[in-house]
Amino acid sequence: MTNIRKTHPLLKILNNSFVDLPAPSSLSAWWNFGSLLGVCLTLQILTGLFLAMHYTADTATAFNSVAHICRDVNYGWLLRYLHANGASMFFICLYLHVGRGLYYGSYTYTETWNVGILLLFTVMATAFMGYVLPWGQMSFWGATVITNLLSAIPYIGTELVQWIWGGFSVDKATLTRFFTFHFLFPFIVAALVMVHLLFLHETGSNNPTGIPSDPDMIPFHPYYTIKDILGFLMMLTVLSTLVLFSPDLLGDPDNYTPANPLNTPPHIKPEWYFLFAYAILRSIPNKLGGVLALVLSILILAVMPVLHMSKQRSMMFRPLSQCLFWLLVAVLLTLTWIGGQPVEYPYVIIGQAASVLYFMILLILMPLVSIMENKLLKW
């Protein structure tokens, strides 16, 4: 008798995706982040769903409703901090996942890569809107500053901003629509994840060597299921430690002050996971130029397949490219630090240098070094 998991129309899909899926035998721990992102998304949707049951999207009561969740709802504090710190874990996993793709040349699967970029943008938009919901000082001013950037778009900018705000400033209408979209977007993300996996399973996974692994495949279950479960346990250990011991470590104290349009905080800054992009935005002393640089800092990932000049796919056997890659990581960490600093000397000049270096490494140095490595190997 044939196993039901191989014949049932629904189970068959799951079987071909998670059980009998042929996977390369050499996948390292860097391939764990895809499944970790799935866990993060599930956790965010579940905690978010329960938070939404008690939250009120109204400027008069939003801040108090979050306080009510933390004080009066059974384990409300746990839900709230799991959701807030879960977002941080989500972005840590996202950036490591993208970094893995860059290092091992996974971007040559262009459809999977492009859907991944779309996912990144959607998750970033979702996180930004979520940060506005508690209606603290940083929520309000962050929303004001970031949405106001759209006014840099020529001709339609001002009308566009007022259309998004639903008025002449960030107010009740803005909060209501941000809550609506913050609730909706994770489900769009879940749908895009399906498309991402669909394209990935068309080609099969890449592996650390970058060499085709068709002759050497193993079933996903039990080998990678057990490996993924170990990853889940490690991530959930870190998350629960963060939530239970220092839940406000990654947050901003200003967000514990209710939103006040008449009082601007001394340093307006986004959550830590957007600081690198914020630093790039601030490093250009022109509004439109800054906005373009901000968008391009992520959109630059889309040209990676075109800029791949090496005859080898992975960086595993390319020490010069590896040096550039880790320099890029250092530059991104520098930008993250600069994004949280005030706009004054020497931070401004460091931010500008790091921003130039960021684009230079990806657009110019990496392709040049790849060509050089080809020549060194007489390819």
Swiss-Prot record:
Lineage of the species this protein comes from: Eukaryota, Metazoa, Chordata, Craniata, Vertebrata
UniProt subunit comment: The cytochrome bc1 complex contains 11 subunits: 3 respiratory subunits (MT-CYB, CYC1 and UQCRFS1), 2 core proteins (UQCRC1 and UQCRC2) and 6 low-molecular weight proteins (UQCRH/QCR6, UQCRB/QCR7, UQCRQ/QCR8, UQCR10/QCR9, UQCR11/QCR10 and a cleavage product of UQCRFS1). This cytochrome bc1 complex then forms a dimer.
GO biological process, one term: mitochondrial electron transport, ubiquinol to cytochrome c
CDD domains associated with the record: cytochrome_b_C (cd00290), Cytochrome_b_N (cd00284)
Keyword presence, Glycoprotein: no
Function: Component of the ubiquinol-cytochrome c reductase complex (complex III or cytochrome b-c1 complex) that is part of the mitochondrial respiratory chain. The b-c1 complex mediates electron transfer from ubiquinol to cytochrome c. Contributes to the generation of a proton gradient across the mitochondrial membrane that is then used for ATP synthesis.
Cofactor or coenzyme needed: heme b
Residues annotated for heme b b562 binding in this entry: 83, 182
Binding site for a ubiquinone: 201
Chief localization: mitochondrion
Additional remark text: Heme 1 (or BL or b562) is low-potential and absorbs at about 562 nm, and heme 2 (or BH or b566) is high-potential and absorbs at about 566 nm.
MF terms (GO), sorted A to Z: metal ion binding; ubiquinol-cytochrome-c reductase activity
Transmembrane regions: 33-53, 77-98, 113-133, 178-198, 226-246, 288-308, 320-340, 347-367
Keyword entries, A-Z: Electron transport, Heme, Iron, Membrane, Metal-binding, Mitochondrion, Mitochondrion inner membrane, Respiratory chain, Transmembrane, Transmembrane helix, Transport, Ubiquinone
InterPro entries found in the cross-reference section: Cyt_b/b6_C, Cyt_b/b6_C_sf, Cyt_b/b6_N, Cytb/b6-like_sf, Cytochrome_b, Cytochrome_b_C_euk/bac, Cytochrome_b_N_euk/bac, Di-haem_cyt_TM
Designated gene of the protein: MT-CYB
Cofactor note: Binds 2 heme b groups non-covalently.
Residue sites binding heme b b566 per the record: 97, 196
Species whose genome carries this gene: Lonchophylla mordax (Godman's nectar bat)
Protein name as it appears in the record: Cytochrome b
